[in-house]
A protein has these predicted regions:
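Residue(s) in the substrate-gating loop at a strand-loop-helix junction
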Residues: 68
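Substrate-binding pocket helix/loop in short-chain dehydrogenase/reductase
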Residues: 19-20, 27-32, 132
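Short C-terminal tail/terminal secondary-structure segment
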Residues: 73, 151-152, 163-176
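A short helix-coil junction within the Rossmann-fold of NAD(P)-dependent oxidoreductases
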Residues: 1-2, 18, 45-60
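Short, small/polar-rich loop/turn modules that mediate ligand/substrate recognition or access, typified
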Residues: 100, 105, 162-164
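Active-site helix of classical SDR
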Residues: 43, 84, 92
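A conserved structural motif in NAD(P)-dependent oxidoreductases
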Residues: 136-147
Length: 176
């Protein structure tokens, strides 16, 4: 196994966009299992490993949960996704309080829609692209390197007093 673990970037997620009244138990379970249960279990395993390090209090540690701007707002046809991302924001806060005594910081990074091959088909639909871009005051999608830079910052000593909070990278979506 790993000799030590200092940083976890906990990133898992899926969405099945559909109206609230049409969500099946199967789809609810699929999204909850990946977006909440898997992230919980990965964090739990990582913390167990982190706590095995004898000098943890002086060495420190960081858990970075990748959530979404949707963990701070609501949106139509994204009820289950919003529910799960709000849950991880809550997990982030609870773990930050519980793990502070071990000098393990727990934060989240909450990006807006990102320009990736996975989102490309969604933005090929003009009505969806307009709906999203109309809600981002900066008028553009996020880039992966912007999220990566945030991860580097939150994992670093530059963020040594930052715990229990969310770094929202959304071009102003949640500011409205």
């Amino acid at each position: 196994g790993l000799p030590a673990l200092d940083v976890l970037v906990n990133n898992a997620g899926m969405n099945i966009p559909e109206p609230f009244v049409e969500v099946s138990e199967e789809n609810l379970d699929r999204v909850l299992d990946l977006n909440v249960r898997a992230m919980f279990l990965v964090a739990q395993a990582a913390v167990k490993k982190m706590l095995q390090t004898p000098d943890r209090k002086t060495r420190g540690g960081a858990i970075i949960n990748i959530t979404s701007q949707m963990g701070h707002v609501g949106a139509p046809a994204r009820t289950v996704y919003c529910l799960t991302k709000h849950a991880i924001e809550g997990l982030t806060k609870a773990l930050a309080v519980e793990l502070a005594m071990y000098n393990i910081r727990v934060n989240s990074i909450a990006p807006t829609f990102l320009d990736t091959p996975m989102t490309e088909p969604m933005f090929a639909r003009p009505e969806f692209a307009k709906w999203v871009l109309d809600r981002i005051p900066m008028g553009r999608l996020g880039q992966l390197d912007e999220v990566a830079a945030a991860v580097v910052f939150v994992a670093s000593e530059a963020a040594s007093l930052m715990t229990g909070t969310s770094l929202v990278i959304d071009g102003g979506w949640t500011a409205q």
